């Protein structure tokens, strides 16, 4: 197999581990390449995220590193995360588990698809999110007013500090911290979670991906859309955000660990 390695570059131990893993994988007969940022810190040549086109991408880092990799890849390639972060909901393996895992899976892996949301503003596509799109004011202590329309029907209007448009995968990220539910990633839906809403009646909504979902920014205050913490876009007043299911899901290696077992383990070890 052709395997591309990506490491967080702010941790020397992570880089050393990645270099060691590269040698181990080559010893198992795999063709190994390094992402160019990782390669530069190891004194090697590498390839850009946009050029990644192999059988597997191994990310040594936390959820942020995995999100960056998925966000930057031009073509979605199966990802396996090795946790070198705080929680690592998107990183299934611990560093000491990787060697055994690869030795036991020399012929291939079971791949799990995770839906992403495609976000556009006023008809202009801005990108896909694996975790969430965040609409937030750029002026602290100023609230925004939102209108939510499902199949053209007004479903909710509320004032809040911001709004999260999350995937089921993202339900264990910012959305969970904001009071949203944990959603089984096998469910395909759009999770809307208001941030500090003015009215207690403004609750999270889980909406089928089969419906047409639009969110209007009913305010003249400046706001921004942040996609997976990676890309930021300024929103015009009275902008309309259209949310659709992306036709390019993220691909992850399924390591055999049940989702709710992972959630229970990681939340108890925060």
From Swiss-Prot:
The active site is at 63 (proton acceptor). This is NAD kinase. It is found in: Cytoplasm. Keywords: ATP-binding, Cytoplasm, Kinase, NAD, NADP, Nucleotide-binding, Transferase. Its main location: cytoplasm. NAD(+) binds at residues 63-64, 131-132, 142, 159, 161, 172-177, 196, 230. InterPro entries: ATP-NAD_kinase_N, ATP-NAD_kinase_PpnK-typ_C, NAD/diacylglycerol_kinase_sf, NADK. Its cofactor is a divalent metal cation. Involved in the regulation of the intracellular balance of NAD and NADP, and is a key enzyme in the biosynthesis of NADP. Catalyzes specifically the phosphorylation on 2'-hydroxyl of the adenosine moiety of NAD to yield NADP. It catalyses: NAD(+) + ATP = ADP + NADP(+) + H(+). The keyword ATP-binding applies. Gene3D superfamilies: Probable inorganic polyphosphate/atp-NAD kinase, domain 1 (3.40.50.10330), Probable inorganic polyphosphate/atp-NAD kinase, domain 2 (2.60.200.30). Its EC number is 2.7.1.23. One of its GO terms (biological process) is NADP biosynthetic process. One of its GO terms (cellular component) is cytoplasm. Belongs to the NAD kinase family. One of its GO terms (molecular function) is metal ion binding.
């Amino acid at each position: 197999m052709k395997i591309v390695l990506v490491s967080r570059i702010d941790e020397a131990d992570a880089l050393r581990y990645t270099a060691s893993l590269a040698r181990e994988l080559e010893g198992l007969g795999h063709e190994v390449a390094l992402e160019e940022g990782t390669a530069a810190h190891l004194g090697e040549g590498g390839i850009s995220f946009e050029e990644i086109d192999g059988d597997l991408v191994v990310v040594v880092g936390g959820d942020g590193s995995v999100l960056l990799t998925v966000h930057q890849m031009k073509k979605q390639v199966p990802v396996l995360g090795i946790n070198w972060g705080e929680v690592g909901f998107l990183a299934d393996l611990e560093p000491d588990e990787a060697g055994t895992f690869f030795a036991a899976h020399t012929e291939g892996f079971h791949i799990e698809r995770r839906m992403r949301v495609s976000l556009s503003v006023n008809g202009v596509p801005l990108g896909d999110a694996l975790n969430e799109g965040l609409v937030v004011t750029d002026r602290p202590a100023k609230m925004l007013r939102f209108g939510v329309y499902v199949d053209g029907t007004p479903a909710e209007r509320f004032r809040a500090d911001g709004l999260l448009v999350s995937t089921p995968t993202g339900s264990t990220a910012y959305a969970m911290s904001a009071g949203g539910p944990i959603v089984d990633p096998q469910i395909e839906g759009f999770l809307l979670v208001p941030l500090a809403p003015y009215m207690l009646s403004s609750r999270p909504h889980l909406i089928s991906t089969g419906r047409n979902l639009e969110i209007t920014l009913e305010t003249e205050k400046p706001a921004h859309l942040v996609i997976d913490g990676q890309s930021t876009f300024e929103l015009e007043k009275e902008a309309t955000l259209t949310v659709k299911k992306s036709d390019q899901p993220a691909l992850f290696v399924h390591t055999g660990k049940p989702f709710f077992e992972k959630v229970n383990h990681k939340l108890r070890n925060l």
